[in-house]
Curated annotation (Swiss-Prot):
The active site is at 161, 231 (proton donor), 327. Keywords: Cell cycle, Cell division, Cell shape, Cell wall biogenesis/degradation, Cytoplasm, FAD, Flavoprotein, NADP, Oxidoreductase, Peptidoglycan synthesis. It comes from Shewanella baltica (strain OS195). Its cofactor is FAD. NCBIfam families: murB, PRK00046.1, PRK13903.1. This is UDP-N-acetylenolpyruvoylglucosamine reductase. It is found in: Cytoplasm. Belongs to the MurB family. Its EC number is 1.3.1.98. The keyword Kinase does not apply. One of its GO terms (cellular component) is cytosol. It is an enzyme of class 1 (oxidoreductase). It catalyses: UDP-N-acetyl-alpha-D-muramate + NADP(+) = UDP-N-acetyl-3-O-(1-carboxyvinyl)-alpha-D-glucosamine + NADPH + H(+).
Length: 341
């Protein structure tokens, strides 16, 4: 028997799960008022932004708090624009706002689904730019103290799809606002695939934005039509020696050298070369245009998605010796779990 409140329209996979209670917070004070009593009573609680990075495997036996706070404040000095953005703002709409007001630097991250509050948790990124490149600070509700805390970018301990919010502050913090610093002497970032054809001397931020939107729209299915969470797997990072070994065996392997001498592999390429592009398992499938994306073909459960993900991980490991990691959070009845449900 499902619980009182359906979550189907609040998760981009379109999974038909429910929760015991569903509340909306339209300000950081409301976040504080709603989340603190739940945390203090040790009751199951899930803070939800856009629901674009979640796989529900069961009904959630607790309260889902939807963060819907809005607001963008802008200040500037000679060097940069400074934005204070509330957690409930839509990420893509924020990028549109910055472009309309002559502020550049976010355009490579166009069409990443979700809200601003989720951005620092995952250190979201695309086409060579990550949130950490433009983040100035993050404000969060510290659940143990009940106070609002603001920490610097360095204190966020950002790494590839990682942050302090997934580590030391996991389940202890609710992001309420993000500070961004967009420099006025804008430099285009054109290292990745579809952007390499641009001339860095003449390209505009708007042109990059439109190209990224075009490419993402062609490759990534619309969640309203075909449920998905965008990129399901992280691009694995391997040692230079491992990469050279793989490149000898698979000369067309796609890899990007990192500053610390490691190499980031293209997970989509690995999945496709393992023969899994378009692979179907029940009502879940690997997308036939972008192998990095798992989709709900209609009627899939969270467990179906997890079973497919485990199959992909096993096949890629068998062929390449590389272990893929899932990006989305896996949510069970009482909190976060893993793929093995």
């Amino acid at each position: 028997m499902s619980l009182a409140h359906s979550l189907k329209s609040f998760n981009s996979f379109g999974l038909a799960q429910s929760c015991a209670d569903l509340v909306e917070a339209h300000s950081k004070e409301a976040v504080q008022a709603m989340c603190l009593p739940l945390w203090q009573q040790q009751l199951p609680m899930l803070v939800l932004g856009g629901g674009s990075n979640l796989v529900f495997t069961e009904d959630f036996n607790g309260t889902v708090v939807r963060v819907l706070s809005k607001g963008i404040k802008v200040s500037e000095d000679a060097e940069a624009f400074y934005l204070e953005v509330e957690a409930g703002e839509n990420w893509h709409e924020l990028i549109q706002f910055t472009l309309e007001h002559g502020m550049f630097g976010l355009e490579n991250m166009a069409l990443i689904p979700g809200t601003v509050g989720a951005a620092p948790i995952q250190n979201i990124g695309a086409y060579g730019v990550e949130l950490c490149d433009v983040c100035d600070w993050v404000e969060y509700l510290d659940l143990p103290s009940g106070e609002f805390v603001r920490i610097s970018t360095a204190e966020c301990q950002f790494a590839y799809r990682e942050s302090i919010f997934k580590d030391k502050l996991r389940n202890l913090a609710v992001v309420t606002a993000v500070g961004l610093r967009l420099v006025k002497r804008w430099q285009p970032r054109l290292a990745y695939g579809p952007l390499q054809s641009f001339d860095p001397a003449t390209v505009t931020a708007r042109e990059i934005f439109e190209r990224v939107c075009q490419v993402r729209s062609e490759k990534l299915p619309d969640p309203a039509v075909l449920g998905n969470a965008g990129s399901f797997f992280k691009n694995p990072i391997v040692s230079a020696a491992c990469y050279l070994d793989l490149a000898q065996r698979f000369p067309t392997i796609v890899g990007y050298a990192q500053a610390d001498a490691t190499v980031k592999l293209a997970a989509g390429w690995l999945i496709e070369q393992a023969g899994l592009k378009g692979f179907v398992l029940g009502n879940a499938a690997v997308h036939d245009k972008q192998a990095l994306v798992l989709v709900n073909r209609g009627g899939a459960t969270g467990r179906d998605i997890c079973r497919l993900a485990l199959h992909v991980i096993a096949q890629v490991q068998d062929k390449f010796g590389v272990v893929l990691e899932a990006e989305p959070r896996i949510m069970g009845a009482n909190g976060e779990g893993d793929l093995y449900v």
